[in-house]
Structures are given as structure tokens and as C-alpha cells.
Curated annotation (Swiss-Prot):
One function term, GO molecular function aspect: ATP binding
Localisation per UniProt entry: Mitochondrion
PROSITE patterns: PROTEIN_KINASE_DOM
Gene3D superfamilies, sorted: Transferase(Phosphotransferase) domain 1
Identification of the protein by name: AarF domain-containing kinase 1
Predominant cellular place of this UniProt entry's protein: mitochondrion
Domain Protein kinase: 149-468
Gene ablation phenotype (knockout): RNAi-mediated knockdown is larval lethal. RNAi-mediated knockdown in adults results in the thoracic muscles displaying abnormally orientated fibers as well as an abnormal increase in mitochondrial fusion resulting in mitochondrial dysfunction in ATP production, ROS generation and cell apoptosis. Consequently, adults display a held-up wing phenotype, are unable to fly and also display defects in locomotion. RNAi-mediated knockdown in salivary glands also results in an increase in mitochondrial fusion.
Amino acid sequence: MLLRRVLGYGVVGAGLASAGWSLHTNDYDPNSLGIVRLSRSAAAVVDVALTYKRELYYKEWDKETPEYKAEKSRVHKIAAEKLLQLICINKGVYIKVGQHIGALEYLLPKEFVQTMKVLHSDAPQNPIEDLYKVIRQDLHCNPEEIFDSFEREPLGTASLAQVHKARLKTGELVAVKVQHPYVKGNSRVDMKTMELAVNVLARIFPDFKIHWLVEESKKNLPIELDFLNEGRNAEKVAKQFKKYSWLRVPKIYWKYSSSRVLVMEYLEGGHVTDLDYIRRNKIDSFAVANRIGQLYSEMIFRTGFVHSDPHPGNILVRRTPENSLEIVLLDHGLYANLTDKFRYDYSNLWLSILKVDRKAMRQHSEQLGIKGDLYGLFACMVTGRPWETVMQGLTKVKYSKEEKNTLQNNTSLVLPHISDVLEQVDRQMLLILKTNDLIRGIESTLRTQNRMTAFWVMSKCCVQSSYAEQRAKQSDSGSSRILWLRVRERWELFKLNCYYLYLGLINFGFLEALKQVI
């Protein structure tokens, strides 16, 4: 009896000590306690579930009627606002997941996507004193010993960190990225909480299948929380694309960096979707779209090292002193590392889509994990275009606002099947789908979706990737076989140039068409 009482007191004491230590390390902020965050999340999940049960699932609907569609849209909006409130209170990892949802424009109901998009630019910020504390803890010195000046207003605030402009004692202007002090300590319990919430919602709503999102977040979060890894990624991608004089990646100041503090070169520019900035500086929006398309096509189909967070705040455009266009690529915390096999299969999938070859689409979709007739939906998710357009030929049908609205409105009708695709597909594909959607969003804002150059550059990269893998497989077959594959590759590229020159002539005239393929 005495032993049981002692053990009981010990457990309670350990719990209180753990809570006390958590409060102490987070400046006595009760929001840092796992039980507080868990309770808040549980209450929000129950609230959302009851909202659907009360507002939508209380009766049998004819799901084809306008009344049902309007009511479902209204309830989606209410639920999304409730989740946004939870995200903004719990911050940190929750904001990261919310941003991910806000990027999946063609994969989730538009009410959730539009509601979460605010998190890309308006994430909650921390007082400067909290950031100074992180700098002192990690760099073992006061900020005044490193910086001549440190602007109190952040340049930007994201889910895991915020960035401030500063000047080093040595005179260089730098951008200082400091991790929010509460993020790392709360990350483990937050991911467990989200996993639990998703499991509960999946039991209530069988069509609610976003386990893939939690799995990806659990895998990627520790990587993103290590700013030294981000610095290494920045240097790697700068080296890979040094041939492009128009691409700038900020230099890293390793002497002043740690796992929670990253000091890098300060580079000015306007957000890639800031149309006023682009007009004021006489920047060609088509040239911007072409270079971003070229960069990401090479990343996905050639190098396999893909910057996976290209939202507008992470891509700047500017004019150099020589008056040429420059793209500045920021935030290198999350990269997809694609295997050679994945790049080969994905390249062949795109080539089959561009050739409107249904049999090959099914075959290469299966190589990427998609079973049966879901290959058609998968092709729509990859391209961001309706099936009718895919079958007519992407290069023959111009993208329109009506098409975008149709696609978004139909998303909710096929949401269970979209969930099936995301559960089945090769995990490497998840970051690529997110990246594709973000790039399409940039093109939409720049109004450059109908430019043939994007397809031309991507088609070239697909052909080169496909033949490179074929040559690698035939490395023991002798030089004649390798030579034949090179000849076939050259022939395919020649046909592509002729085809896109022809499309350019039809759409833009001779001179403009010639510029696109030179």
C-alpha cells in the first residue's frame, strides 16, 4: 500500500516537474504545454466533426443538386475557418501543415485551400526579444557583438521562423533567419496530436484520407528544423545551377549560423507575383515564367534535387545593375531527393500525356504506384487540367478561367478518389504535386499559362531524362547501342523543336515562335 502511494506520488511529481520544466524553458507560456495544445486540438476536431454532422450529414441529400453543393461549400468554409483559428493559436508545426493545405489547389476542396492561403504571407510573428534569446543560446554571444544594426520589423514571418534584415560588424547586409523558440520543443507532441486528429476524423468521415500529409510532415519536419541543413542545400543548388547567370542563391555566413539561426546574404527584389513591382521595373513576366519553368524542369527531370517550397515569398525577381533579369531563390529548408527510377517513370508519364497515349499513361502511372482506372485522375492531378483537355492534347487547348473553375468545382466530387491516389502514389510524388501546384499558381498570377515555352522546356527535359536512364541501363551493351540511343534522343529533340515552332507560328507569329525555340 505504501509502495503504491509512493509510486503514485512519484508519477504525479514527475508529471508536475515535466510541466514545470516545459513552462520554464518556454518563458512560462502555458501554450507550450502538450496537454493544453492537445486539448485545444481535440476540442477543434470535435467541433469540426459536429459541424459536419449538424449542418450537412443530418439528412440524405441528392448530391447532384445545386442545394447540396452550395450547402457543402458553406460547411467546408465554416470548418476551414475553425481549423485556421486552431492553427493560428497553436502556431509552429500547425502553420506548416496549414501552408501545405493552402498549396494543394487542385487536390483539396477550394474552401480549405483559399482559407489556408493567408498563412503563406500572414503567419503570426514573435517579439524581437524572443529571437535575441535564441541567438544568445545558439551562438553564445549577444546579438550586439555580431550585428551593427538589427531591424525590429521582420522581412517575413513563416511557420517555423522569421527573417530580419541586419548589418554585420564587418559591414555586410544580411538576412537573419531565427527559428521560433517554441517550435522545436512542441514539434513532437504536435505531430502526435495531428496524427490522432486525422485518425479520429477518418473514422467519422471515411472519405477523409490525409494520412499521407501527416506522414510527410513527420518525415520532413526534423529536416526543416535544422537550419544547417538548409544552408547546405543552398550551397548545393547554387553549385548545380552555376551555369545560369540569372539565378542567385544567397551566400551563407557559416560563422554566425546554427541549427536554429541562419545568417545569409541579403538580396533585394520583388515577390515573383508582385505585378506592380514587375511593371514598375519593366520586367518581362513571360521571361520570369520561362526561367522558373526551366529551373524546375531541370530540377525534377535532370538533377532530382528539387526545391519543394516555391511559394511566391520564396522567389524574388529583380533587375541587375547591367539591366538583366535575375531570379533569387530563397528558403532551402525542404528539398525532394528523387531517385533515378522515379525521374525515369515520371518523365515517361509526362511524355505519354503530351503524346495523348492512354495505354502508356496507365503503364507509367502503375510504375508510380497508381492502380487501375485511377490513372486518368492521376494525369489530371499531375497536369492541373481536366481529363477532356488531357485527351485533346495539352498543347492544343488553351488554359482558361472557366477550365480552372470547372476543375476546382469538381474536386469535391472526386475527393474520395483523390485521397485514394494520394494514399497509393510513390511518396516522392507528394512533394512534386505540391511543387507543381505552387508553380501553376505563380503562372496563373503572371497570366502566362498559355505560353508554349513551358511545355517545350519540360518536354526537352523529359526526353533527356528518359534517354539518360535508358543509356545507363545499356552501359554493358556496347558503344553502338549507346550511340543509337543518342541518335534517337537527338531525333526526338529535333521533332520537339519543329512541333513547338509550328505551335508558336500558329499562336504568336514567326519571330516570337523563333524566340521560343532558340
